[in-house]
Amino acid sequence: MKKVEIKKKTIKELNIELMNLLREQFNLTLQHSAKKLQQSHLLQHVRRNIAQVNTILAEKEKECD
């Protein structure tokens, strides 16, 4: 997901996106531990997306205060 797309979302949408990414990370981690994950780079992409969403979310919450 691109930063431009993330910045356009509202705080509520970002929280929903964050929950979806955390769920996806959990599922990928389980697959990785069971040695069923063929594309291990997906785990890194999800982690990066979580960090981006958290950063933008913190910026937006700081703007509101």
From Swiss-Prot:
Question: Its Gene Ontology molecular function terms?
Answer: structural constituent of ribosome
**Keyword field:** Ribonucleoprotein, Ribosomal protein
Quote the cellular component terms of the Gene Ontology held in the record: cytosolic large ribosomal subunit
One GO term of the biological process aspect: translation
Q: Which family does it belong to?
A: Belongs to the universal ribosomal protein uL29 family.
The protein's name is Large ribosomal subunit protein uL29
Q: What's the gene?
A: rpmC
